């Protein structure tokens, strides 16, 4: 691991810091021309998809050691929070005036961050932190008043969104890489074996149904216009009420 002083890995002479010039890039959708480049600064490796918050005025991205908010028009870094971790994969989610993030390896932690800060807001805008039930791969899911996470041990956790307190846990069968999704009042959890669990959200584990595609599924399912889109290792499935008839 390249060394920048924030990792516990030993330094090695001559190793470069590949994220030194890392940016958040905004492109014109029609022409592909660069609109702006927002500097990430001391933020190590991350694999997250950025999200829009604050009525679309900010882009929030999480990387190793940092969660950051950028002005969507100018690329200016508006705020930053220290969040130790390497190889961050879960994308941030937003709900109830909070941004929920999971850090990567080294110090796994789920954090809730209040909107509206400027500068380094590590000491002022973290609403709560939880070191149990931290998702390492699948993104969190917010369904008021709860936040749901799936750990590397394939355990589904339900937490109070306002406090981070764990409401219930349930060990899932199989391995889970895909993020859970919410649609039409139900939570859908897809395993690598191609099994989708349909859950009723709430203060207890409530499984309604289970469906098996019988194929390997690593990607998260997408939901659009009343249909589900699932990419397996072999096929792309479109599932809706119309196709079920």
Language-model-detected regions and their locations in the chain:
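A short loop-to-beta-strand structural motif that recurs across blades of beta-propeller domains
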Residues: 22-25, 66-68, 109-111, 155-157, ...
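Extracytoplasmic beta-rich repeat domains
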Residues: 2-21, 35-56, 62-64, 80-95, ...
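Short loop/turn segments immediately following beta-strands, especially the blade-tip
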Residues: 110-121, 161-162, 198-204, 240-245
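Beta-propeller blade signature
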Residues: 18-32, 112-115
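Loop/turn-rich, solvent-exposed surfaces of beta-rich toroidal or solenoidal domains
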Residues: 108-110, 132-201
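Short loop/turn segments immediately following the C-termini of beta-strands
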Residues: 2-6, 64, 104-106, 115, ...
């Amino acid at each position: 691991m390249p060394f920048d002083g924030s990792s516990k890995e030993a330094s090695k002479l001559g190793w470069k810091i590949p994220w030194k010039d890392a940016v958040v890039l905004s492109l014109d959708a029609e022409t592909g021309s660069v609109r702006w480049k927002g500097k990430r600064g001391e933020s190590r490796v991350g694999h997250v998809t950025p999200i829009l918050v604050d009525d679309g005025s900010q882009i929030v991205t999480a990387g190793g050691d940092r969660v950051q908010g950028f002005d969507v028009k100018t690329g200016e870094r508006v705020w930053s929070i220290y969040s130790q971790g390497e190889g961050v994969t879960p994308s941030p989610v937003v709900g109830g005036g909070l941004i929920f993030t999971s850090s990567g390896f080294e110090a796994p932690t789920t954090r809730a961050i209040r909107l509206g800060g400027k500068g380094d807001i590590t000491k002022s805008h973290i609403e709560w932190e939880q070191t149990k039930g931290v998702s390492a791969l699948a993104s969190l899911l917010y369904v008021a008043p709860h936040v749901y996470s799936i750990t590397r041990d394939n355990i589904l956790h339900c937490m109070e969104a306002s406090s981070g307190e764990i409401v219930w846990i349930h060990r899932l069968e199989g391995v889970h890489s895909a993020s859970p999704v919410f649609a039409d009042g139900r939570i859908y959890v897809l395993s690598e074996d191609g099994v989708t669990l349909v859950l009723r959200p709430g203060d207890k584990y409530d499984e309604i149904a289970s469906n098996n595609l019988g194929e390997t599924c690593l990607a998260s399912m997408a939901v659009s216009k009343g249909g589900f889109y699932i990419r397996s290792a072999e096929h792309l499935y479109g599932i809706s009420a119309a196709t079920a008839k």
